[in-house]
Amino acid sequence: VPELEVDQPRIYFGESADSDDYVVVNSLQDEVDYPLSTEGQSVAYTNYSGDGGVGIGSFFKRLGFALRYSELNLLISNQLGDGSKLIMERNIISRVKKAAPFLYSDNDPYLALVDGNLFWIIDLYTLSDRYPYAQPADTTRINDRSGLPGNFNYIRNSVKAVVNAYDG
């Protein structure tokens, strides 16, 4: 069995991030990557090199995001530089719903490893409760967290959304 090689294991976009959550990358302080020992006293550091995020190097961008998130530190921090970026909308399901609000998403995305990079795959469905000559679906066994409405007679897994776990 060949080994799976992950070239980029870092995940900035995922299913557990709050939809209003943001993270500042490329600040003047290195990001903690992983512990080098089992005691956790020494750690490896990294810096974000992806394409995601909005540059917040200028005063007016920092002011705008400080007002948007009610976070004074975005405005007054001396840890932000010209290359600093703000990554927002990190929850992949809410990100996909904003891109395609007319589709219903599966609330259980899964990771795939493609060419050394991690990608989230989200199933998207088209639904109707007016499909001719079709009986209503039995929805009694559908999980409440599924994101599907309770009444439909047609469902099709018509779209797969793919989100890069590092870049978004």
What do these predicted regions represent?
Residues V1-D167:
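Soluble extracytoplasmic regions of secretory-pathway and membrane proteins
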